[in-house]
UniProtKB/Swiss-Prot annotation:
It holds the Pfam family Asp. Keywords: Aspartyl protease, Disulfide bond, Hydrolase, Protease, Secreted, Signal, Zymogen. It catalyses: Hydrolysis of proteins with broad specificity. Generally favors hydrophobic residues in P1 and P1', but also accepts Lys in P1, which leads to activation of trypsinogen. Does not clot milk. This is Aspergillopepsin-1. Its main location: secreted. GO terms for biological process: proteolysis. It is an enzyme of class 3 (hydrolase). It comes from Aspergillus niger (strain ATCC MYA-4892 / CBS 513.88 / FGSC A1513).
Length: 394
């Protein structure tokens, strides 16, 4: 483990922003997420969301979760319970609102190639106005809850914050399932995992980050997701105003294409730390924290009235409950997830029973630290090494 002090933090992105050099320079920039208009409400299927997270990493979706997902247990509110963080991105001549996902490597978007009934409410990519089609190239993604998307591939200009590339592979949806259509706030996904797991056939394409990182001061991005508020992505530099104390670095395992790493233990509430570490993935595209069964069971033993519900497809408890904090140990650093974040959402509109923000990884062999974990941290994703850095948010 390496601890990186604030005083040594990389702030080259700030200095390059005021550089007067006429030649193209490397840079750093910040892109803010936004909350979509409050009238863009939708229905989320909590067990379906859980199933997608398991299937995304090749996990087995339990039958009880499949059945719960098929029954459509849901809650309806604007931008439900931090389920997604959306970021404006210019693709060709269109501005779209995308989910930045460190657990996948595709840039796919709603497009005007979709049937008109599936376009309603979404901002659309129009490849005919700006793009070059990659003849014979296709993409096809499916998830454990039955949701799917597929289509053609184009080469086009993509701008995120202060950086533009005119040669980015863009996957335009021509077929998409109702689960995606219903979410009118979200126009697609921008993957920030390693390019090795891009799904384009016959040849995988490069992620936006891998395409533009040579333009950045440093080949990294940092994430500050927030609870009940839009978050921020810093590309090319580290903003020391966004964290407290020091950044603790650990090696990232990219062998499976994800931002994987090893933890050194965990603790529940005020209890002592377990020295049993686990392998994990830092994933902004997963909402929940997915852990080994023994850790999940140990956690909910400390939550009054908690039970594993087949009907709901996971652990639930009274919405009036204050769950204990959950702490992940990384070297000498303790990353604390406040218990209120783990009281995730009512299992249905008006219900007094809530779905837990910690659920089983169903024997996946990896733990997934999604947004419930990440919105308590400032996390640095550095492709040099590669390595991950963690610090408490300021």
């Amino acid at each position: 483990m390496v601890v990186f002090s604030k005083t040594a933090a990389l702030v080259l992105g700030l200095s390059s922003a005021v550089s007067a050099a006429p030649a193209p320079t490397r840079k750093g920039f910040t892109i803010n997420q936004i909350a979509r208009p409050a009238n863009k409400t939708r229905t989320i299927n909590l067990p379906g969301m859980y199933a997608r997270s398991l299937a995304k990493f090749g996990g087995t979706v339990p039958q009880s979760v499949k059945e719960a997902a098929s029954k459509g247990s849901a809650v309806t509110t604007p931008q439900n319970n931090d389920e997604e963080y959306l970021t404006p991105v210019t693709v060709g001549k269109s501005t779209l609102h995308l989910d930045f996902d460190t657990g996948s490597a595709d840039l796919w978007v709603f497009s005007d190639e979709l049937p008109s009934s599936e376009q309603t409410g979404h901002d659309l990519y129009t490849p005919s106005s700006s793009a070059t089609k990659l003849s014979g190239y296709t993409w096809d993604i499916s998830y454990g809850d039955g949701s799917s998307a597929s289509g053609d591939v184009y080469r086009d200009t993509v701008t995120v914050g202060g950086v533009t590339t005119n040669k980015q592979a863009v996957e335009a949806a021509s077929k998409i399932s109702s689960e995606f259509v219903q979410n009118t706030a979200n126009d697609g996904l921008l993957g920030l995992a390693f390019s090795s797991i891009n799904t384009v056939q016959p040849k995988a394409q490069t992620t936006f980050f891998d395409t533009v990182k040579s333009q950045l001061d440093s080949p990294l991005f940092a994430v500050q997701l927030k609870h009940d508020a839009p978050g921020v992505y810093d590309f090319g530099y580290i903003d020391d105003s966004k964290y407290t104390g020091s950044i603790t670095y650990t090696d990232a395992d990219s062998s499976q294409g994800y931002w994987g790493f090893s933890t050194d233990g965990y603790s529940i509430g005020d209890g002592s730390s377990s020295s049993s570490g686990f392998s994990a993935i830092a994933d902004t595209g997963t909402t929940l924290i997915l852990l080994d069964d023994e850790i999940v069971s140990a956690y909910y033993e400390q939550v009054s009235g908690a039970q594993e519900s087949e009907e709901a497809g996971g652990y639930v408890f009274s919405c009036s409950t204050n769950p204990p904090d959950f702490t992940v140990v990384i070297g000498d650093y303790k990353a604390v997830v406040p218990g209120k974040y783990i009281n995730y959402a009512p299992i249905s509109t008006g219900s007094s029973t809530c779905f837990g923000g910690i659920q089983s990884n169903s024997g996946l062999g990896l733990s997934i630290l999604g947004d419930v974990f990440l919105k308590s941290q400032y996390v640095v994703f550095n492709s040099e090494g590669p390595k991950l850095g963690f610090a408490a948010q300021a």
